[in-house]
């Protein structure tokens, strides 16, 4: 009987450890995805801030050609 209790506790302990590891990996993955989204947003903002300069450059070129 004691052997069965020890085995059961061992199985439960190993299950909790593996669950904890999986949750930690999931949390790290979510943080990496969040960081990637923030990087993408900042790149998009930088690109959008360049659009007025590009438009004015194209307009001045068109004015010189036209």
From Swiss-Prot:
Sites bearing Leucine amide, chain numbering: 65
Record's keyword annotation contains NAD: no
Tissue: Expressed by the skin glands.
Pfam families for this protein: FSAP_sig_propep
Assigned keywords, A-Z: Amidation, Amphibian defense peptide, Cleavage on pair of basic residues, Immunity, Innate immunity, Membrane, Secreted, Signal, Target cell membrane, Target membrane
Region of interest (Disordered), ranges: 25-44
Proregion residues excised on maturation: 23-46
Subcellular location: Secreted; Target cell membrane
GO cellular component, one term: extracellular region
GO biological process: innate immune response
Composition-biased stretches (Acidic residues): 30-41
Signal peptide stretch: 1-22
Keyword Membrane applies: yes
Family note: Belongs to the frog skin active peptide (FSAP) family. Phylloseptin subfamily.
Function summary: Antimicrobial peptide with high activity against Gram-positive bacteria, low activity against Gram-negative bacteria, and moderate activity against fungi. Acts by causing bacterial membrane disruption inducing leakage of the intracellular content followed by cell death. It adopts an alpha-helical amphipathic structure in membrane environments. Also shows highly potent antiparasitic activity against Leishmania species. Shows moderate hemolytic activity on human erythrocytes. Is also active on human monocytes.
Name of this protein: Phylloseptin-S6
